[in-house]
């Protein structure tokens, strides 16, 4: 049985870099089934804006004035028609340990048939942010293919 997700949430540590970049990239892709796309963090102490390096990389890739405010993943974000994709395996485990009824939690790479994590960018130079953007762009293409193929079933 194919699950028809109504929402997809990307999750990273504090929702100011990798997850919002993935969200913004995916929102520009064509999905055959309308899907609400959001991002959240595991540890959001206050609603901070997008990381300046992530913002610079997005701007240089044609996202004019990307804006984002970090939000904490909450129990009410999670239900049976929500697909949650984490950047790292430890975040997936944290969600299973912290939240109830989280049946559809995968890492981004796991969901598209790859192994490994999308590593944290904390303290990294702009070039590493750019490399992460390129990796996320490729992963989002694979994700679109998977989501659209599931819609056809």
Q: Which stretches of residues belong to each language-model region?
A:
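Phosphate-binding/catalytic loops
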Residues: 89, 93-153
